[in-house]
Structures are given as C-alpha cells and as structure tokens.
C-alpha cells in the first residue's frame, strides 16, 4: 500500500538517535574538578558535567543538524546516487521503548519522490558551534517496497568545518565490492579514501584517519638521556607490528623518535563512547597510574620502619588489615569513587585490596610443586609449555655469540624422580615438558644483572604423572660467564626438596622461574601477542574494507577499544620508566626484548590447534573431536580453548561461505586483496618476506585468517588477561622481579635463608613498593566493564546486517557458546580432573564465555578492550 500512496512531494519519516556530548565527554571527564583528574571524572561526576557545550536536546533543533538521503538505486548524470533535499531534526521523541540509556531520539522528514528509488546512504552535517555529538542510528519507516531501513552509525559527529568531506553513513545492508549497487560505488570508494588520509600532518582530535607508524614514541629523550628508547619496527634487528600514526613532531635529541603528549591521537570513533561512567576503565587505568600509584609509593617510602614485607602474613595483610595511610594522603584519594571500586577501606584509614582467588581457600597451597606446575597449563600464561623432544635440551641461540647453551640438566638429575621410567622412555611416551625461559632472556641477562635486579635464564623440566598432573623434576638457573658471552652460561641445577634449607632453596628456584614467566607473560603473551599484533589488522580493515563489506562487519566487534587501550599503554604502561619497566624484571629492555621475540611470530600458528601441535602438546588426530589429541589430557586451557576455537571457526565458516560462493570470489574481491596486501606488507611489514603468510586466494585461507584473528582478540586475550589479579594479586605466587641471586652455601645469605626463609624469599622477589603498584594496575586490567561486549554478542543487536542467514548463524554461535559454558562447568565439577582446580581449589574459569562486571576471573569479551 505504501508504494501506491508514495508519489511526488511525499515525505519519508525517520528517527535519529544520538547521545549528547556531555554524556560521553572524555575531555570533560579528564578536566573534572576532582582530587584525581580522570578517576574522579570516570566515577561519578559525569552527571555533574551538565553539558558545558550542549545544555539541552533543544540545541539539536532548528537548522543545527542537516541530513540528506542518497539513493542506492537511482543515479544522477554523473552515475552517483541521487541526493535528496536537506532535512533537519525536528521534535524530541520520548515514547520509544527501545531507547537506550542517555540516548535522545528526534524525528526527521525527508522529501523523497518515488523516482528517487530506495535510500542506501545519507549525509549528515553538524552546524552547532563547537559541539560534537555521538550519532547512534537513523531509521527510515515505511519506505516504498522496502518497509524499514536502518543505519547503524555509532560515530562522533563534529562541526562540519572540521571535515574536508561530508560525513556519510550506509544502510545496514552488506555488499561485496562487486555487488555494490552502482549508484553507491563512488560513495563507498570516497569514504575509504577519506579514512586513509594522505599520510601527512599531525592528526587532530576530530580526525578519522587510520595510518601506520613504528613504535618510536616510548621514550622521552628530550626530557633526559636515560629515557631514550630504541625504535621498534622498521628494522630486521628490532621488528614490530605497526601502531596507529599520530603525526606528532619528532624529538630534538633523537630525530627518529616521536615526541610524547598526554593525549594520544586515535581515529575519533576508536575512543568509543561508554554510557556508564564506571565503564571508563581505560581512563581509570591512566589515573591509577598517574595519581594513586605515586601516592602509595610515597607512603611506603616514608614508612622507614616498614619499607619491606617481612613475613608472608605481611603480604596477606594487604587484603585483611590493609595499608595504613597518613591523613593527608587519605584525604587526597579517599574522595575518589575509584577508591571504593579498587579497594575496601571499611571506613578505616587503610587501603585493602580484594583477596586474590589463589589464596581464598588455602593460604599456602601456592607453594606446592603441583600448583607450580599446574599454573603452566591452567594459570595466566598457559600456552608456553612445550614437549621435550630430545635430551639434553638444546638452545637456538647463536653459539658464536653466546657459546654452548645446551642444558646442564642430565638424566642423573631426572631419573631418580621418574618412578622407574628412563628419560628416553619418558620422551618416547610424551611425558616430559618444559616452560623454557632460557633463550628469550639470556642475551639480555648481563645488562639486566648490571642493574638493581638480579636474575637467571631458566629451564624447568616437568613430568606427566599417571594421575594426569605435572611434577617438576629439575630447574636450571643460568648466568652469563664472567669472561664473556661467548664462553656460554654458568649453570646450576636444582632438584625438588621438601625439608630444611633445601626446601627453601627449591622454593626460591621456582620463584626465579615464575619471575621469568611473569615477564614473558606480560610483554609477550599478553602485550605483543594480543594487543600489539591486532592493531595493524584494525588499521588495514578501516583503510580498505568498507563498512558495508562482509568481512568488515564480521571483524568489527573484535576491534572495540583496542587502539584506545594500546595508546594508553604506550603512554603509561610500556613507555620508558612506565609501570612495566618499573615493576618487572626486564626493566628498560622490556619492549626491546619483546621485539626480539616477535621475529619468531607466525600468524598461522596463533590459531589454537596449530599452536598446540607446534608446541608438541597435541598431535593431529582426525578421530578426536577437534582434529587434535592432547598429550596432556587434563590441560584446562587447551581443552576449553578447543571448544571455543571450534565454535568460532564454525561461525566464521558459515559466514564466509554465505558471501563468497567460490574461491574465485576471494581473488576477485579488490577491497579484501588490498586489505590483506597492506596488512602483510605494511602493518606487519617487518615479516612481509615470511613464506607462511596466507596468499588469500581461497575461502579456506580467509576462514582460517578470520578465525585466528577473532581467537586472538577474544579467547586468547581473555585467557592471558583476566586471571592477572586472581593469580598474580598474591605477589608471592607470581613475583615480577628478583633482586638477589640464589644464596650459596657458606655465605651469610644462606644462613639467613636457613633461619627465616619467608624473609629471605621476600627480600629476593618484588619489593613492597612495586607490589602495590603492580596490584593496583593488574586489578584494573583484570576487571570487566558493565557494558562489556562478550563473544556471541553485538552492540548493534540484530541491526548489524539485513541478511537473515548470517543473522541466524550468529544466533547459533551464541547458543553454542552457552552450551560450551555448561560443558566447562561440568568439567570443573569432575574431581578426577585434578588440574582444573589444583591444590589451591581454584577452578579454571578463564574461558567461560560469559561474565558479570568486575573482578570475576571469567568471561570472553569480543575484543581487547582493557
């Protein structure tokens, strides 16, 4: 009926949903009048920043916001879709039941004759002086022959004068480039050109340009020489994934380095708008780094009588009694609402951290050998362990530079604890494993040990017992030879002991291993292998895949907030003398060492089955549920991860095969080919010559590539991130530094260890000051925001595409994830699977897909959002 009535001079009714700047204003938050800047802003003052620029919804009325529809089916003389007459926002609508929190809805009417065809895009211009707003969506009702047309926008709209080209949005239809309606083709191409920019100039807050740069902004050499840091990326010696380009001016003293600033440019929509103030975790993290941490450090420094932990009970008092604070310090941070979020003050002049899960049931179970080994397959860094395939363990380091680094662990060390099995027999039956932290650390060990920290390159050998648990057999600690690196390491092997000073020595040996694991986890497993490697994908996607491209729509949820948190990390976490350098063993060499590890990064091996096979902890087996058979059968991360991996891949396969009916369609997709070419040659350009890159010529490769990317951004990041505080919040269990070497027999240090092992242990690992810093930061990192988007969810709800087949496939994906969660819960209730809860009685929940907000030790967000 609508098509019969719709003729010349008729009007199309639309509804525009937007959010006022004062609801989401990050700048206002950072400037909030509060003792602690962003923290005060991020919690609780949002409502009081009553629109310094936009006071009421009436500011949008009149001729403030102009829209014009663009036809998808009827072209003008130049071949471009016809553009309607201008229309402006009209009345404020208050009766829309689906309206989100803090959202405003406005009506709009477009003049749209039947000879204009069907709308497929629209222009929007903001003429308000100085005020940007967040455009959520436009919905057109009763469009002839179509019905409703929805445009999911989710974008900041600045004053028209800030843009060189008009802001355009497309309807939520999905098109391969070759299937784009002819009248929309040039609009699609022009928008991508806008997002690519021209590679020049310093980027401004309102810009939307995506471009690449090397990591040359970690140091501050103009401030002082010791803050200079090498450029990561652009060389074969220190290769690195690319970051987003900001165009800031270069430093004076190091022209290859970029100057730093408090705010780092992001393409505007990457600084996503959150509705609830408590969701500004990124900004909370920044404020915790810049405000709370210095206050805590000053308190500990001033406590001259108690600058160190002396007993394990002292550490536990962080959760029980708390840190007593002087009145002046308390007055500075207690008004901050974050105070009650991160700490439990209970009305006392003290800060209390929440008790980490690892000690909630048993205070001392973390010290057992079984728990030490279990955390290598069910802890926060569960994907480093690999099978020992030959003996003795060999090094891949250049022997001309570093001498013979073959392990000094012998059969005689191992066989007394193998229960009658020989080393050869254990290898043949796939029962020897190692988390090898020797090669990554050894080349930097001499430099690290020249500082206040003292460390070893470590090797650990584990035995898979008949009951399915792992048992540590030996730990090798190595230091550089005093006569030079080419002489090889000086190594000593330590064996398990349960009594006397030997038990204390063994506990320290395990601590040196965990310190190395903590550093490798934070800089490689977490930062490099999730945060850093994904950023080039985000940049390449936005530069070459239109928002209406099916692969853009598939990947978009897995990019949310990642460039944002990465920019913050470069500013306060991984920068020179930032949180990581200050509190982790690798110190000033942390990022440089991660660059050396990146040389061996292989994209296809980031997919879980390939990763397990490469590490020798699984073998291909077509008869097994996911095509691989685990050699450590009770391996919580791997067994749970394979369920999630299979669900992701099944979803991606259905999706890709719907849009690409043949392999030829992959090769013929110009946008996809440009995206992949630039990703390989520029985004990960330092590895562009590697032969392992997919050629992107068939559906199988595209399915695998998308599955791997989604896996990294969701499940892999969840596995290595959200357990940081539950496991590492108890510093005794996951120390981040070592300050002393192992005591030698006959020395005063050895005697001290024999008399008081707790004090000796605490004087060896992370000091009190750094512990408080570390705990404050990893508690924020381990939290979920209340508006977190989890795997199987989309922020647009059902409006992300009009195609019913992908919609139904996505719903099945969500349903499958719920079924998997039930299965994982059942596994955790199976007492025969000892590695799932261990001596600490802490079930492995990190790969449960869903979660509530807060510190939950579970939940798989879609993206690397914290």
From Swiss-Prot:
Compartments it resides in: Cytoplasm
Show where the Lipoxygenase domain sits: 174-866
Principal cellular location given in the protein's record = cytoplasm
Q: Which residues bind Fe cation?
A: 526, 531, 717, 721, 866
Q: Which spans does this entry mark as compositional bias, Basic residues?
A: 242-251
EC numbers, comma separated:
1.13.11.58
Q: Which Pfam families does UniProt cross-reference here?
A: Lipoxygenase (PF00305), PLAT (PF01477)
Residue intervals of the PLAT domain = 42-171
Q: Which GO terms describe its cellular component?
A: cytoplasm
Q: Give, as in the UniProt entry, the pathway in which the protein acts.
A: Lipid metabolism; oxylipin biosynthesis
| Cofactor(s) for this UniProt protein | Fe cation
Recorded GO MF terms: linoleate 9S-lipoxygenase activity; metal ion binding
Organism domain of life: Eukaryota
- Reaction catalysed by this enzyme: (9Z,12Z)-octadecadienoate + O2 = (9S)-hydroperoxy-(10E,12Z)-octadecadienoate
> Cofactor note, please?
Binds 1 Fe cation per subunit. Iron is tightly bound.
Q: Name one GO biological process term.
A: fatty acid biosynthetic process
Q: Sorted alphabetically, which Gene3D superfamilies does this protein's record hold?
A: 3.10.450.60, Lipoxygenase-1, Domain 2, Lipoxygenase-1, Domain 3, Lipoxygenase-1, Domain 5, PLAT/LH2 domain
The entry describes its oligomerization and partners as: Monomer.
UniProt protein name: Linoleate 9S-lipoxygenase
Annotated organism of origin? Lens culinaris (Lentil)
Q: Which gene encodes it?
A: LOX1.1
């Amino acid at each position: 009926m609508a098509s019969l009535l719709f003729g010349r001079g008729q009007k199309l009714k639309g509804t525009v949903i937007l959010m006022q700047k004062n609801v989401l204003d990050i700048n206002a938050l950072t400037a909030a009048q509060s003792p602690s800047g962003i923290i005060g802003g991020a919690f609780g003052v949002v409502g009081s920043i009553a629109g310094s620029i936009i006071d009421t919804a009436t500011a949008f009325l009149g001729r403030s916001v102009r829209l014009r529809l663009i036809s998808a089916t009827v072209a003008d003389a130049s071949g471009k879709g016809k553009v309607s007459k201008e229309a402006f926002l009209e009345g404020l609508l208050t009766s829309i039941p689906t309206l989100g929190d803090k959202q405003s809805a406005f009506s709009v009417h477009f003049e749209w004759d039947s000879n204009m065809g069907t709308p497929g895009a629209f222009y929007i211009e903001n003429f308000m002086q100085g005020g940007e707003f967040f455009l959520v969506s436009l919905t057109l009702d009763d469009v002839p022959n179509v019905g409703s047309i929805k445009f999911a926008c989710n974008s900041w709209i600045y004053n028209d004068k800030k843009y060189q080209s008009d802001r355009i949005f497309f309807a939520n239809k999905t098109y391969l480039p070759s299937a784009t309606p002819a009248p929309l083709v040039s609009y699609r191409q022009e928008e991508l050109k806008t997002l690519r920019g021209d590679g020049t100039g310093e980027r401004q807050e309102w810009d939307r340009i995506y471009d690449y740069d090397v990591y040359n902004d970690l140091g501050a050499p103009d401030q002082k020489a010791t803050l200079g840091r090498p450029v990561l990326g652009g060389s074969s010696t220190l290769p690195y994934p690319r970051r987003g380009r900001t165009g800031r001016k270069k430093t004076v003293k190091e022209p290859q380095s970029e100057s730093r600033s408090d705010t780092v440019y992001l393409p505007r929509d990457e600084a996503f708008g959150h509705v609830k103030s408590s969701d500004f975790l990124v900004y909370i993290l920044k404020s915790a780094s810049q405000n709370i941490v210095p206050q805590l450090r000053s308190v500990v420094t001033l406590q001259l009588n108690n600058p160190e932990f002396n007993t394990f009970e002292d550490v536990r008092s962080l959760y029980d009694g708390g840190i007593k604070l002087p009145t002046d310090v308390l007055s500075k941070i207690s008004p901050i609402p974050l105070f009650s979020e991160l700490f439990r003050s209970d009305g006392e002049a003290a800060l209390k951290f929440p008790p980490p899960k690892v000690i909630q049931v048993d205070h001392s179970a973390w010290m057992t050998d079984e728990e030490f080994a279990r955390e290598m397959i069910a802890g926060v860094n569960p994907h480093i362990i690999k099978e020992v395939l030959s003996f003795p363990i060999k090094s891949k380091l250049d022997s001309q530079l570093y001498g013979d680094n073959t392990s000094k662990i012998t059969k005689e060390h191992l066989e007394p604890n193998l229960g009658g099995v020989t080393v050869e027999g254990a290898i043949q039956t796939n029962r020897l494993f190692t988390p090898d932290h020797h090669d990554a650390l050894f080349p930097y060990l001499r430099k690290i040990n020249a500082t206040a920290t003292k460390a070893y390159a470590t090797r650990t050998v584990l035995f898979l017992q008949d009951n399915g648990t792992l048992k540590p057999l030996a730990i090798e600690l190595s230091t550089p030879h005093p006569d030079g690196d080419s002489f090889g390491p000086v190594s000593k092997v330590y064996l398990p002991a349960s009594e006397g000073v030997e038990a204390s020595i063994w506990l320290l040996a395990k601590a040196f291993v965990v310190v190395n694991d903590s550093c490798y986890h934070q800089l490689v497993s977490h930062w490099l292998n999730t945060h850093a490697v994904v950023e080039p994908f985000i940049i390449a996607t936005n530069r070459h895949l239109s928002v209406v491209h099916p692969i853009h729509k598939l990947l978009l949820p897995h990019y949310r907030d990642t460039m944002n948190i990465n920019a913050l990390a470069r500013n306060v976490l991984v920068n020179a003398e930032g949180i990581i350098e200050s509190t982790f063993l690798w110190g000033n060499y942390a990022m440089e060492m991660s660059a050396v590890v990146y040389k061996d990064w292989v994209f296809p091996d980031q997919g879980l089955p390939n990763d397990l096979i490469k590490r020798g902890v699984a073998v291909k087996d077509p008869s097994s549920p996911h095509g691989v058979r685990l050699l450590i059968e009770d391996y919580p991360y791997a067994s749970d991860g394979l369920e999630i991996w299979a669900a992701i891949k099944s979803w991606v396969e259905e999706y890709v095969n719907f849009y690409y009916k043949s392999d030829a369609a992959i090769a013929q997709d110009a946008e996809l080919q440009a995206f992949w070419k630039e990703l390989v040659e520029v985004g990960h350009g330092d590895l562009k010559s590697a032969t392992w890159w997919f050629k992107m010529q068939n559906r199988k490769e595209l399915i695998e590539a998308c599955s791997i990317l989604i896996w990294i951004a969701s499940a892999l990041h969840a596995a290595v991130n959200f357990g940081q505080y539950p496991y590492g919040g108890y510093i005794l269990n996951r120390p981040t530094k070592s300050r002393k070497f192992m005591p030698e027999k006959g020395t005063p240090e050895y005697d001290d260890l024999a008399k008081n092992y707790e004090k000796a242990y605490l004087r060896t690992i992370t000091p009190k000051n750094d512990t408080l810093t570390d705990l404050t930061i990893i508690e924020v990192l381990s939290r979920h925001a209340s508006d977190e988007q989890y795997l199987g969810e989309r922020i647009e709800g059902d409006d992300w595409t009009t195609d019913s087949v992908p919609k139904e496939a996505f719903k099945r994906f969500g349903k499958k994830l719920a079924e998997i969660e039930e299965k994982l819960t059942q596994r955790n209730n199976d007492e025969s699977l000892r590695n799932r809860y261990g001596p600490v009685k802490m079930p492995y929940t990190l790969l449960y897909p869903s979660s509530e907000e807060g510190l939950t030790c579970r939940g798989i967000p879609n993206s690397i959002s914290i």
